[in-house]
From Swiss-Prot:
Putative baseplate hub protein. Induction: Expressed in the late phase of the viral replicative cycle. SUPFAM superfamilies: Phage tail proteins. This is Probable baseplate hub protein. GO terms for cellular component: virus tail, baseplate. Keywords: Late protein, Viral baseplate protein, Viral tail protein, Virion. It comes from Escherichia phage P2 (Bacteriophage P2). Pfam families: Phage_GPD. InterPro entries: Phage_Baseplate_Hub (IPR052726).
Length: 387
């Protein structure tokens, strides 16, 4: 958005916003009192958060009712404002002196049904069907990534567990990310740079001149080298055991400076066709320093998905990068793929995914801070069965 804007040389960009309370525009009521507005766009089921600080030196600011809905738009004067969603007020603070009112609102109403404990079981269904059913009973619209929607779920229990926690557990097992944004329950493929409908998110390019601060760190090389998951089922009465290893297939690009020494590509090897074992263990990576998932899964397929999801998460965390943009970018969201330039080669050559966006706005400025992780592009796997 902003990198495509043109404005007169020497002109000054002025931050702008619009705030609506239950569909009523209250921008004019607070414009002279606004001290700061902070909007945090989080990945996953950590709700997006809106913090507004208002000057109440004269004691005339009315405290909003918890449960009220705020809709916020931010950007720059002279350009179209970007809607950042609806937020439910769940905290109000008053402090002094000088007196200040802080209003805190979140994208999902965690005082509502999403956070209520439930009992239930799901049989012979799919991941997409479960997500849609939960969305419906929470008055949300479901949007599930096609690659996840068709995953078969033979049986799973929801015992004294909120829908929020249950969905998070499903996401962790199947390599997804779940969140609530703009009245939609989103179930995405984690770190792939695609929307819930499967469309690719346009890549954003950020140069060093766009920011005024950055931080880069490579994780400990002695971290986990693999993940194991166990399964146990009774379809085959034979007391067979099977151990399955997961390794990455070779791909054209993989930044060696960020590549774990135990995550190197290997030659493709076809596994012999054998009946699925009644019980077994599945390993992603190498056995030197293994993270063992404690859950025992019902099938080999479930164990494989869980191990792959955890292994991918560990690989995405091999490096971290953050940057503060001096000129705010209201058009940037989490899961957006990013290429950067002007930094060290090891940073510039890596593909990145945004995991957190923080917009800070007041009457004199608008900045955006980004947190990014390594993007796993077009990752494919091969398996080896050890009898």
């Amino acid at each position: 958005m902003l990198d495509a804007l043109t404005f007169d040389a020497g002109s000054t960009l002025t931050p702008d916003y619009m705030l609506m309370l239950d569909s009523r525009d209250i921008t004019g009521n607070i414009s002279d009192r606004l001290m700061s507005m902070t909007l945090t766009d989080n990945r996953g089921f950590e709700a997006d958060q809106l913090d507004i600080e208002l000057n109440d030196a004269d004691g005339q600011v009315g405290l909003p009712v918890r449960g009220a809905v705020l809709t916020v738009y931010i950007g720059w004067k002279g350009f179209a404002l970007v809607c950042k969603g609806k937020f439910t007020v769940d905290e109000v603070e008053h402090r002094g002196a000088p007196d200040v009112v802080t209003i805190r609102a979140r994208s999902a109403d965690f005082r509502g049904t999403l956070n209520s404990r439930r009992e239930g079981s799901w049989h012979d269904t799919t991941l997409g069907a479960i997500v849609k059913a939960i969305a419906t009973r929470n008055r949300l619209e479901a949007s599930v990534a096609p690659s996840l929607a068709g995953i078969k779920i033979p049986h799973i229990d929801q015992s004294q567990e909120s829908d929020a926690k249950f969905l998070t557990r499903l996401a962790e097992r199947n390599g997804g990310e779940v969140s609530v944004k703009m009245g939609k329950l989103l179930f995405l493929k984690a770190g792939q740079g695609v929307t819930a409908s499967g469309k690719k998110i346009p890549q954003v390019t950020i140069t060093r001149s766009d920011g005024d601060r950055h931080h880069f760190a490579i994780a400990d090389r002695g971290a986990y080298t693999g993940v194991t998951a166990k399964w146990l089922h009774t379809k085959d009465p034979k007391p067979q055991k099977q151990k399955v290893k997961l390794k990455r297939k070779k791909k054209e690009k993989h930044l060696r400076a960020l590549e774990h020494p135990k995550a190197k590509p290997v030659r493709q090897k076809k596994a012999p066709k054998v009946p699925e074992a009644r019980e077994g263990e599945y390993m992603a990576g190498e056995a030197d320093n293994v993270f063992a998932l404690t859950t025992v899964y019902a099938t080999k397929a479930q164990a494989m998905r869980a191990a792959q999801a955890k292994w991918d998460k560990l690989q995405r965390g091999v490096a971290e990068f953050s940057i503060s943009l001096a000129t705010g970018r209201a058009d940037i969201y989490t899961e957006t793929p990013v290429k950067v330039s002007g930094f060290k080669r090891v940073i510039d050559e890596q593909d990145w995914t945004i995991t957190k966006v923080t917009h800070f706005l007041n009457n004199s400025g608008f900045t955006t801070s980004l947190e990014l992780e390594v993007r796993l592009s077009d990752v494919e796997y091969e398996t080896e069965d050890d009898e």
